[in-house]
Amino acid sequence: MEQTQNPNNQRRVISLLVDNSNGVLARVASLFCRRGFNIDSLTVSATNDPSISRITVTLRGSEQALSQLILQTERLEVTRQVFELDPEKSLQRELLLLKVACNTAERAEMREIATIYKSKIIDLSPDSMVFELTGRPEKINAFLKMFSGYDILELCRPGITALERGGKHQHMQKPAQEVRDAQLPLPGTHCPQ
């Protein structure tokens, strides 16, 4: 029997360009929380413009709920742009640090798995190994599955970071401020209740 994925629970990756100032991350995360979204992962990074930061958020939800969230996020005065990244038109990467208990006999097997997945061994002790792997979330999941039979001591997956493919930014239509200005009533008119 073929399984279909629930469209209301699809993983979605949102990219935000925001002002690089104090409290911005808290405001954005608070909005997501108030709207009932559970954040699966969140990364924040600098951009080539020191006044702008990039926030990449991974969450689950329906297209309709996400569209509403994007509109509300665009209304924040700290938001420059916000959009969903299409998995087929974006580069999404995740980092994994994995510490596994091992004995001498298990080391060769673990090194073989690391070689196949192009993982790095970044620490080695008499009773453990630490691996570093970067790749698509599906690759990270497959790597972890290979280690499911071993004693995993610790792991860290900080979150997905992503950019659109291609030379030009596909979402550079209007700055978010223009969107907000277009939603404000003209002077002398009243806001609808």
Predicted regions, residues:
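Long, contiguous binding/interaction regions
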Residues: 1-53, 58-193
